[in-house]
Amino acid sequence: LRKEPDESEEQEEIEDEKKTIKIFPSQEFYSTNIDIPGDFSSASFLIVAALIIPNSEITLKNIGINPSRTALLKVLVEMGANIKINNVKENIERTADILIKTSSLNAIVLDEKLIPNLIDELPILFIASAFAKGKTIIRGAGELRTKESDRLEAMSNALGNLGVKFQSYRDGID
């Protein structure tokens, strides 16, 4: 952060044939504290790991929980996840501590309306679904084929390498 120059302050000019550079006198800079929350998409991997690893209990502190980014939490809770949101703070972005405990997950039929708010977390949801009881159905996720890489194909390959039984479709996985 810097103080804007006062119009009365003198400017020093350096000129050559093509360019002019204006240099203002020394200015005061002020420090400030900035609290940068943890990224929810990055936290999602730890959330799912805690859910599926026996006897796990972790708290992820100061994670951004903007409602447009946390659809995965709603889906996991619907699957039976033991997740608690604590210490909610209203900053520039809403943040909270997320407590996760090992849980027995159940399969779901994912509502396609949730896909736009889950697009970055779908690969980790596939992993959670592999540990759920029953058959999870995910459709409407064709956008994953056009991201930086074909994430549906990559996840299909990864799930196959792990021995997970699934069926891949152009817009999702069962």
Q: Which residues does each PLM region occupy?
A:
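Short, structured segments at the rim of ligand-binding sites
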Residues: 1-174
